[in-house]
C-alpha cells in the first residue's frame, strides 16, 4: 500500500486504463470488465481489476492535473509493477474541423507546465507516447472501424483561462486537443521505465463554446473506451 492507494500487492494488472474521473473508471469496470472488484478507494480515487477477453485488466482514476496524475502513475509503476498506463480521458478542441465526441490518439504532448523541465534538469523533454501503446491504439481503432485523429495535444496547468493568443498559437501548431495530464504521464513513464499512451474524446470545443454534460463525460465515450480495451488486449499478446 501507499499513502494514496490501499490495494494489496498484486492487485493491479500490468496494464491500467487511467481516467481522470474515478466515476469513469467505475463505469468502465461495471460495464466492460468481467468479475470486476474494487481494489482501492483512498480519497475516493477508485480503482478496479477485472477481466476483458480473458485478460486481467485494471482501471483507475488519476484526478485532475499533472501533479495528481503523476503521483498515481509513479506509485502504480514503482509499488505495484504496472507496465502499461493508458490515459482514457476528455479534452477541449480549438481547431475548426474537430467536433464534439471526436476521438484523438496522442502522439505527443506539449505543455505549459514546468514539471518535465524540473524532472529533466531544465532541458526540454520530448513528451511522447510509447510506440507499442500508440500503435496498439491505432490498430484497435482501425479494427473497430472507428475514426481517430492522431497528433499532438496540449497539457495545461490552467483550466480556466481566456488567453486568446494561446488559442491562436495552438491552432497555428495544429494542436488537436487541450487537456491536463498527458505530458506529465509520458514523463513519469519515461523516468521509471514504463510505457504510457493517451486516447481522448472531445468533450468541449473551446472557441465555439460547445460542451458535453458531466454525465455524458462519464458514460457516453464508448468509442474511446472500446479502442483502449482492445489496445490493452493487443499489449497482452
From Swiss-Prot:
Listed binding positions for phosphate are: 20, 24, 43, 87-90
Q: Which residues does the record give as a purine D-ribonucleoside binding sites?
A: 4, 179-181, 203-204
User: Which Enzyme Commission numbers does its entry carry?
Assistant: 2.4.2.1
Which top EC class applies here? transferase
Catalysed reaction, written as an equation: a purine D-ribonucleoside + phosphate = a purine nucleobase + alpha-D-ribose 1-phosphate; a purine 2'-deoxy-D-ribonucleoside + phosphate = a purine nucleobase + 2-deoxy-alpha-D-ribose 1-phosphate
Query: Which biological process terms from the Gene Ontology are attached to this UniProt entry?
Result: purine nucleoside catabolic process
Q: Which UniProt keywords apply?
A: Glycosyltransferase, Transferase
Quote the subunit structure annotation: Homohexamer; trimer of homodimers.
Question: In which family does this protein belong, per the annotation?
Answer: Belongs to the PNP/UDP phosphorylase family.
Q: What is this protein's record name?
A: Purine nucleoside phosphorylase DeoD-type
Recorded source organism is Dichelobacter nodosus (strain VCS1703A)
